């Protein structure tokens, strides 16, 4: 038990007042401003204007601190949503930049801790682990031998103070945390940061990086304790997850010390399952096990109580589904994943007799779902709800080469991401929709017919919808039938895909 306490106490920051002076450095906000302008690769541009004054940001922060320590400090109220100026300046842009500056500054101690941890250790190529596709080879290796999976929707914190309290265990800088708390509570349009959807919350486009940092940090906190208990109860340590845990260390909350000391043995019996695997991406997680339905129900109730008791997050049990892998498909990261039995007939030859032996093996399949994809194309006006291609009038003013390049780029991105699909029939249908939509857009622009345009462009239009691997196959394999058959059976996972943003880049 003493060893558990020591392990949970790792990672406390030893530096005080480290972040607070950086908040007043102009280069921090210049860095945040430049990163906001150039982050369209990962997130959509927040609409920053080039007209930006670092001096105004500094004055705003100084004014906020002055107001914070005054007794009557409410410069603007949360209920007063029409108040948009401080000291005569528009606060929308500068409040965003202050949040971005906070994000840059707060990330510094975590990055330094990571570098100090990696000193003297063999560094892995983490850029490969950043790829979304790196998850699927892991699922292929592990999930084929498992029976049940928990499909979990991770809840958001219901109060800002939960995020601040979690952050203060890592950053021992009371001044900066007080300023952050004051700014969050006094910012008049905080409610616009969280957009409520059907069954979950999502962050709005404004200040995404800062609130993604807070939310991801909160998720890593509960995952650290969760995986710690899992590893302490099993001889099969989670080696594949160890790399990600290097970035975060475990800690012990003061109020939980009695709980861990008193109930540790009672909790660990739930975790004694060696074939247990956990995968998370964004707000969804999968917990798969080789155990029975009863064991998965215990996991479900434990996770709900874990969130409520330790992190004060209310989560309804219906947000966690128990599915059997053999007869249920998982909708995860845009793929429909399932485990199916593959039957093989083997002929065994004896001296005089021969007989057939049937072998059954499990195989992990990944398929591209066609219905959601057609829905996305329909929303973007490339086709109707039935999947019939339409012209794109909004692009008619572009040049012919730009129109063809845009359609071709969308298909190449989709083909690149869904290269892991076992069957390419749905991807070929998407290719047909985009090609015909491109031809109809060009015909609409030149007031001609689709037939004439297809005849005029010929292979020129077709080549724009070739992916890199398709071009290699068509050059190396002369027969079209063998090429299409080879492409149909190929399943490729790439290590350079870090986001899913196929269509929105052009909308």
From Swiss-Prot:
Subcellular location: Plastid, Chloroplast
Function comment: Usually encoded in the trnK tRNA gene intron. Probably assists in splicing its own and other chloroplast group II introns.
Annotated keywords: Chloroplast, mRNA processing, Plastid, RNA-binding, tRNA processing
Identification of the protein by name: Maturase K
GO cellular component: chloroplast
GO BP annotations listed: mRNA processing; RNA splicing; tRNA processing
Plastid found in the keyword field: yes
UniProt key word Chloroplast: yes
Coiled-coil spans in chain: none
The organism's taxonomic lineage, starting at the top: Eukaryota, Viridiplantae, Streptophyta, Embryophyta, Tracheophyta
Family: Belongs to the intron maturase 2 family. MatK subfamily.
GO molecular function, one term: RNA binding
